[in-house]
Swiss-Prot record:
Name of the protein in question: Protein turtle homolog A
Gene for this chain: Igsf9
Domain Fibronectin type-III: 507-611, 623-718
Location (main, coarse): membrane
Subunit structure as annotated in this protein's UniProt entry: Interacts with MAGI2 and SHANK1.
Extracellular side: 21-734
Gene source species: Mus musculus
Keyword Disulfide bond: yes
Signal peptide: 1-20
Membrane-spanning segments: 735-755
Biased composition (Pro residues): 944-954
Entry's localization field: Cell membrane; Synapse
UniProt family annotation: Belongs to the immunoglobulin superfamily. Turtle family.
Length: 1179
């Protein structure tokens, strides 16, 4: 801003000069501070009275003029100039009491009031520059006294001003510091001490000088810190009982010093024998009165002023006294039969000169006791402890100051020395990691103390001593090998024994005593082997030359194998007068041991013969230069290296050494026997896809050249030897091999798991198949005719359920049979089965006259067919009702009597088989529907798949049963009653008509059966048994109306169905509750419940229904028919009650099963591999 104003003023001056009115003048006025100065202005006319005008004085940098005078009025003066300015001789301004602040630019202006031209209103004078000279003055100075902690930094700053500007300098203790040096630096009047020390304390003077004068300022720097010992104590010697003074003086700031004295590290006031005889003076000196021999030692002075780490100074005090005995024991034991010593505890200063002994009050004469002598410290040595040594002894020591007197008497006693009871063996061999116990025990008087120690290096933390003083090494480590010493000591003597421990199963131990004998261009290395660790060890000698020049790196170590059993090796081919390092390494099958210590050696040169003196050589033989122009070329055989021989060869070239490396790895010697005459070399055995670097080193005589230039080449795409690829960017080969092995193992494991799973599934399927084969042969329900009976409304009993085991269907396609009515084809017989030549019929089983199960005679096919034709009218309605009558739990109709023609699995001879098996009846087709697939109670239902042809059952007999009654005949003829029963089965035969579907059968049953079972609500084929062993399953939907739903039938309103498509039966939402069902089972634990109404109950309820049954014209032909099957179930033998009848039935059936099993055992078993879902087995 000031420069801008100055430029403005100059521009105004220049512009005014350009106007031509008056040329401005610049005047400089110099004054001293406190004096006066006149600033001239000649704008007024020199003579006459000037016109009316106004005088103004302006100062550059001020907004208003500092002085304004108009006529005779009082001037207007700036407050800073009040009382110090006035006009003199016209318009000149006089300033009194000049100040430094008055220095600057001033301008004089005069305004003439009679001028009418605006351009001539003002007459400006020249600018005047006022300079005020003043002596130097300090604007900033450091304090007079400054305290600074030791080792801290401090800054002393002096700032002065004046006109002209003064120059500031610093002085320390009267000496000019200049620019400073070391820790002290001076710059622009500022003194900076980086690290204050004790010597930095003192007076620092700041001086500001100029032409107007000089001024100074002094600062005292005080360094706060621990004291500094100025006068330390010195070593002193004093006779016993004299006083002594040890000086100690220190300086410090602050000066609140406290002195402390210590003897051998203990405060003198804490030592009881010194408390009353010691004083510490004001100046820090130690005063010790009446010194004693125990007062000798190191004394330390420690001054302190509260700062940390106070200094200290020490001195040694020597006290002279005559020789004296310290403490003589009252008894001295000596070992019997061993060497003993009677000691005389002496102290003396000056040193001891001699000791005299007395025995039993008489002077001891050593020449009378052979083997007795005096030791260097005056002890009495007895070679053999016996009765001659017994007695009372006293000693008197002497030095240059005399003696303090004889010692007290000591009584010599004979004691038994320690003796080992259990000594360790000379050596122990034990495997590493196991436990080793070495015994050692001793006895003596007094009992000795047994201790163990390892000779040489100690073994801390691994060796323990048990309660029996035995050494326990647990676990045994390699470091435990060595010599161990067991010592037993008591007050009489100390005895020792030792043993060697060898640890087996470790790497070799380090070799020792390695020595190298230099030879011409070689060296002979020898050593002493260490323990081999229990295995054969081999040695190798390692050596390397030291670098001749510091800028060259060390060569790699070279190893030479040592023949087995040798402990020395001759290392040839070394450079003479070159320093080598040698080391020996031992190895065995477990690994390498540590290297031995490194030994340096310099091989000698070849012996030379004296040569004739000649002229001194003018040139030094040229050194060996490196090979030149090394290049690498790819060829089909590998990598070919080509080079030129060295340019400088001192003599004959011995050969080359080829070195190579992969990428940035270390250099390796590839071939060290390249002949010196070769200029090219084929390098086989390289790795694919790797960048190689090669170089050559030449050697001749004792010279080894520097490496040649480096030749780079890549083996990418080159077939080399051996052909393998390395992946340096991915994984190392060991890691890669491990990864590949792990992947292969995982694949094999997965494959084995899959095979095991398949094998287990096959075994599980085989076990299920064998389980089915071991089960009882199925009881086949063979329909003998067509059922065309009427039914009456009623409720069926849910208390009895007949179990079905669904088996494989002989029909190739049940769906096709049901939809199109195609006749079922018999299954293809197994080619290896004896049944392949024809079906094997089943024998009928029925009751005999005595009520036992017996085999009945077979019925001829013609008779069966005739029976079937007579019992079944050939109407479409009868065809639709061909399915077997299976009543559900709902009252769909009167259940029809069931005729089991033959439940025996015992087959007739093959020659007796008259005809093939009949085709599957409507009941079997009905049971093969998907609804009955869900009713499997044994868990063996096969999956829904296309049935394959399978061999037929072992035997199925179609002969009607002979008549056998369970109950006594009723009053009315049973034949008539049985004749009127609808649905009586006449026989089994193969019909030429197509089979009826289950849908037609169910529709006919709904129309015919409801009127027949109004008074006979017995259990049906699908009702549940009251026995706890029975299993429930789903049934077809009920056809009887009911208000509630059954737990075995779908709920009302349910839109789901148990059949679908063409197999769907008409749905009827009729169910009965469980609470309305009757229990008709003779035993709740017996599962052979009756599937039909009881005989007595049927006879009682049948008479009212006879008349009503006549109303059905379609049943007239069946009323007078009497078939052999009717006697199978409708003529039971009378029993006293349900329990007795059930027990009798069970016993009879078990007897039948035993006979059947015996018969089956004599027949070949047929392996049925596929079950038929359209056959039902009654359990």
């Amino acid at each position: 801003m000031i420069w801008c104003l100055r430029l403005t003023v100059l521009s105004l001056i220049i512009s005014q000069g350009a106007d031509g009115r008056r040329k401005p003048e610049v005047v400089s006025v110099v004054g001293r501070a406190g004096e006066s100065a006149v600033l001239g202005c000649d704008l007024l006319p020199p003579a006459g009275h000037p016109p009316l005008h106004v005088i103004e004085w302006l100062r550059f940098g001020f907004l208003l003029p500092i002085f304004i005078q108009f006529g005779l009025y009082s001037p207007r003066i700036d407050p800073d100039y009040v009382g110090r300015v006035r006009l003199q001789t016209g318009a000149s301004l006089q300033i009194e009491g000049l100040r430094v602040e008055d220095q600057g630019w001033y301008e004089c202006r005069v305004l003439f009031l009679d001028q009418h031209s605006p351009e001539q209103d003002f007459a400006n004078g020249s600018w005047v520059h006022l300079t005020v000279n003043s002596p130097p003055q300090f604007q900033e100075t450091p304090p007079l006294v400054l305290e600074v902690k030791e080792l801290e930094a401090v800054t002393l700053r002096c700032v002065a001003r004046g006109s002209p500007q003064p120059y500031v300098t610093w002085k320390f203790r009267g000496q000019d510091l200049g620019k400073g040096q070391g820790q002290v630096q001076v710059q622009n009047g500022t003194l900076w001490i980086r690290r204050v020390e004790r010597g930095s304390a003192g007076d620092y003077t700041c001086q500001a000088s100029s032409s107007e004068g000089s001024i100074t300022h002094a600062t005292q720097l005080l360094v706060l810190g621990p004291p500094v010992i100025v006068v330390p104590p010195s070593n002193s010697t004093v006779n016993s009982s004299q006083d002594v003074s040890l000086a100690c003086r220190a300086e410090a700031y602050p000066a609140n010093l406290t002195y402390s004295w210590f003897q051998d590290g203990v405060n003198v006031f804490h030592i009881s024998r010194l408390q009353s005889r010691v004083r510490i003076l004001v100046d820090g000196s130690l005063w010790l009165q009446a010194t004693q021999p125990d007062d000798a030692g190191h004394y330390t002075c420690v001054p302190s002023n509260g700062f940390l780490h106070p200094p200290s100074a020490s001195a040694y005090l020597t006290v002279l006294y005559p020789a004296q005995v310290t403490v003589m024991p009252p008894e001295t034991p000596l070992p019997t039969g061993m060497r003993g010593v009677i000691r005389c505890p002496v102290r003396a200063n000056p040193p001891l000169l001699f000791v005299t002994w007395t025995k039993d009050g008489q002077a001891l004469q050593l020449d009378k006791f052979p083997g007795w002598s005096l030791g260097p410290e005056g002890s009495l040595i007895i070679a053999l402890g016996n009765e001659n040594a017994l007695g009372e002894y006293s000693c008197t020591p002497y030095n240059s100051l005399g003696t303090a007197g004889p010692s007290p008497v000591t009584q010599v006693l004979l004691k038994a020395p320690p003796a080992f009871i259990d000594q360790p063996k000379e050596e122990y061999f034990q495997e590493v990691g196991r436990e080793l116990l070495i015994p050692c025990s001793a006895r003596g008087d007094p009992p000795p103390i047994v201790s163990w120690a390892k000779v040489g290096r100690g073994l801390q933390g691994q060796a323990q001593v048990d309660s029996n003083n035995s050494l326990v090494l647990r676990p045994l480590t390699k470091e435990a090998q060595g010599r161990w010493e067991c010592s037993a000591s008591n007050a009489v003597a100390r005895v020792t024994t030792s043993t060697n421990v060898y640890v087996l199963g470790t790497s070799p131990h380090v070799v020792t005593n390695v020595s190298v004998v230099p030879l011409p261009k070689g060296a002979n290395v020898s050593w002493e082997p260490g323990f081999d660790g229990g295995y054969l060890q081999r040695f190798s000698v390692w050596y390397t030359p030291l670098a001749k020049r510091p800028d060259r790196a060390h060569h790699d170590w070279v190893s030479l194998a040592v023949p087995i059993g040798a402990t020395h090796l001759l290392v040839p081919g070394l450079q003479a007068h070159a320093q080598y390092q040698f080391s020996v390494l031992a190895q065995n099958k477990l690994g390498s041991g540590p290297f031995s210590e490194i030994v340096l050696s310099i091989p000698e040169g070849l012996p030379t013969t004296p040569a004739a003196p000649g002229l001194p050589p003018t040139e030094i033989p040229p050194p060996l230069s490196p090979p030149r122009g090394l290049v690498a070329v790819r060829t089909p055989r590998g990598v070919l290296l080509h080079w030129d021989p060295p340019e400088l060869i001192p003599g004959r070239l011995d050969g080359y050494i080829l070195e190579g490396r992969q990428g940035s790895q270390g250099w390796e010697i590839l071939d060290q026997g390249v002949a010196g005459t070769e200029i090219q070399l084929l390098v086989p055995g390289l790795i694919k896809d790797v960048l190689y670097e090669f170089r050559l080193v030449a050697f001749a005589d004792s010279y080894v050249s520097d490496p040649s230039n480096v030749a780079n080449i890549s083996t990418s795409g080159l077939e080399v030897y051996p052909s393998r690829t390395q992946l340096p960017g991915l994984l190392p080969q060991p890691v890669l091999a491990g990864v590949v092995g792990g992947v292969c193992f995982l694949g094999v494991a997965v494959l084995v798991s899959i095979l095991a799973a398949c094998l287990m599934n096959r075994r599980r399927a085989a076990r299920r198949h064998r389980k089915r084969l071991r089960q009882d042969p199925p009881l086949i329900f063979s329909p003998r005719g067509k059922s065309g009976s009427h039914s009456a409304p009623g409720s069926g009993s849910p208390d009895s359920v007949t179990k079905f085991k669904l088996q494989g269907s002989p029909v190739p396609s049940l769906r096709q049979s049901l939809l199109w009515g195609e006749p079922a084809r018999p299954p293809s017989p197994h080619p290896d089965s004896p049944l392949g030549r024809g079906p094997l019929p089943l024998e009928p089983i029925c009751r005999g006259p005595d009520g036992r199960f017996v085999m009945g005679p077979t019925v001829a096919p013609s008779q069966e067919k005739l029976c079937l034709e007579r019992s079944e009218p050939r109407t479409s309605a009868k065809r639709l009702a061909q399915s077997f009558d299976c009543s559900s739990s709902s009252p769909s109709g009167v259940p029809q009597p069931l005729c089991i023609t033959d439940i025996s699995p015992v087959g007739q001879p093959l020659a007796a088989v008259p005809s093939p098996l009949p085709g599957p009846g409507p009941l079997l087709q009905y049971l093969s529907l998907p609804f009955f697939r869900e009713m499997n109670v044994d868990g063996d239902w096969p999956p829904l798949e296309e049935p394959t042809p399978a061999p037929p059952p072992d035997f199925m007999d179609s002969q009607p049963c002979p008549t056998s009654s369970f109950l006594p005949p009723p009053d009315s003829p049973p034949a008539n009653l049985r004749a009127v029963l609808p649905g009586t089965l006449m026989g089994v035969g193969v019909s030429s008509e197509p089979p009826y579907t289950a849908l037609a059968d169910w529709t006919l049953r709904e129309r015919v059966l409801p009127g027949l079972l109004s008074a006979a609500p017995r259990g049906s084929l699908t009702s549940q048994s009251s026995g706890r062993g029975s299993a429930s399953f789903l049934r077809p939907p009920s056809t009887a109306p009911s208000a509630g739903g059954s737990y075995l039938s779908p709920a009302p309103g349910d839109t789901s169905s148990w059949a679908s498509g063409p197999e769907r039966w008409p749905r009827r939402e009729h169910v009965v509750t469980v609470s309305k069902r009757r229990n008709t089972s003779v035993d709740e634990n017996y599962e052979w419940d009756s599937e039909f109404p009881g005989d007595m109950e049927l006879l009682e309820t049948w008479h009212p229904g006879l008349a009503s049954s006549r109303t059905h014209p379609e049943l007239e032909p069946e009323l007078g028919v009497k078939t052999p099957e009717e006697s199978c179930l409708l003529n039971p033998t009378h029993a006293a009650g349900p329990e007795a009848r059930c027990a009798a039935l069970r016993e009879e059936f078990l007897a039948f099963r035993r006979r059947r099993d015996a018969t089956r055992a004599r027949l070949p078993a047929y392996q049925q591999s596929i079950s038929y879902p359209e056959q039902a087995t009654l359990l």
